[in-house]
Every structure is written in C-alpha cells, then in structure tokens.
C-alpha cells in the first residue's frame, strides 16, 4: 500500500508538468540546481492571467447615417442608398466590429465614387461631402473598436497559459493581421487608394482562436518570475560553490552539468523562441499600447518584454561570473 501511495503522489505531482510542459522546463531546471546546492527549491505560483480593461471603458459608439436626403435617384444609382439601407437593417445593426470595419471601407469607397463619378445636385454634393469627411474622421474609432473591443481581439490579447512551440505556424498570420491594422491607422485622410482592397473578416477566425499575443505576454511574465527566483537561489548560495585548484569541485561540476544539459539544451532555446515570437509581434504590441494609452488605459506587454530581457541578462551574468571565478573558458559560458 505504501508503494501505491507514493506512486500516486508522484503521479499527481507530475501532472502539472505534463499539462504545462513549458513551465515544467523551468521547474526542472530550478529543482536540479536546488538539489545540487542541497537547499530547498523556491515555491512559485502560476503567473496572473493576462486581462484587458472592460469593454465599456474602451468602446466608442458612433452615430448611424440617416437616409434623409439620400433617397434620390442618383444616390441609388451609385450604390450608396442600398449600402446604407442594408447597414441600417436588423442584420446590419448587429454586425461585429470586423464586419463593421469592412462596411466602413466599402462606404468610403462608395462615397468617393458617388462624389467623383455621378452628377449630383448641390444639396446632394454638400451632404455627401460632409458625410465623407465625417467617415474619414471616424475611421480610427472603428479601428479602435476592432482592436480593443471586438470579442476576437479580446480573446487574442488575453491568456492564462504558456506559449507553446506548436504555435510557430500561427505567428506569421497574427503578425500580418497587426500589420494590416497598423497600415489602416496610418492611411492618410481622403487617400482612397490606401484603403485595403481585402476583407478584414478573413483574419478574424485565426485571431480569435490563437490567443498568441496573450500567451506571449503571459509567458514573458512567467519566464521572468522563474529566472528571477532561480538567479536569487544561485546568488544566495554561491558561497557553497567551491572551485579552484586543490579543491573538491564535485558540486561545481554538477552545477555545470545542469547548466549544460538543461539551461543550454532546453531553457535557452525556449527563451529564444519566446523572444523571437515577441519581436515578430512587436508592431502589434506597440499599436495596442498606443491605442490603449489614448483611452487612459495600459496593456503592459512592452514593459513585460523589457523585464524578460532584464531577468534573462541577470541570469546569464551570474553564470558568466561563476565560470570566470572557477576558471572555465569564456567561450563555454552562456550568452544573453
């Protein structure tokens, strides 16, 4: 029965590692170092989930266009009447922000076509010119509603799990979506040729299911915490590490083996993957921070990445200092 009990205990203890293989790498690294130093490992809870401000704090309502003077033959001919009537229908009123953004670009193109290609009365031209100006002014608001309040993007920006190496095939698509949104924000006013010819809805499904940005953010925080607690474990016990001529260097050799077999082979490649993924999403991170700031809010992923780089460098510097003290050739020491 005792054997069965301890086997079950080991099984339960290992479940967390199985469900979080990325976290398990850092746990194993930390545990092995603690074992070699003959000290208890530090306890570390899972990092807090990544969240964003409530939708009500970020959403901006825009007035609907009234048909009014648009009920003319010319405006029916140029397609504007039918486009707005469809938007004001029951189905059009419940469009999500991605579909609404497609509608806004179609509306701008249609308004431009009506103004440049069809004979209009003075009242019609005055009305359409005013609407055209308003819709260009409102475009950043519609973009903000996509980026910050759509269910798709709110899922993309939040997470409570580590970034998996299996996410590699999602990176290019998510990066492309952020690039397209950024290009829309930078579209000069009234430069119709700079509006996208594609539908933004095509990006929606992949963005919604991947949570890539949120997972990168969560992993940056989690990695920083694990590196910090592990560096402190090493620093606070470095007097235990004996090396030099005519000294028993068994413990140092064991530490070096842990460094080579776990840090170099497992931890460092994962850190590089996380950093590379963030770099590919950097334009999106900057865009999110900028737009959040305009609403008096903050996301925080850029600061999380800075902290991640700082904690990585601190950990590397400990090993470099230890190897120098113990006479290990610098070429064999870790690099940031």
PLM feature spans:
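Sec-dependent signal peptide recognition
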Residues: 1-7
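C-terminal motif of bacterial Sec signal peptides marking the signal peptidase cleavage site
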Residues: 12-14
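Sequence contexts marking disulfide-bonded cysteines in secreted/extracellular proteins
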Residues: 16, 79, 115, 242-244, ...
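N-terminal Sec/ER secretory leader and immediately downstream segment
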Residues: 19-166
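Extended amphipathic alpha-helical interaction segments
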Residues: 132-284
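Alpha-helical oligomerization segments
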Residues: 275-336
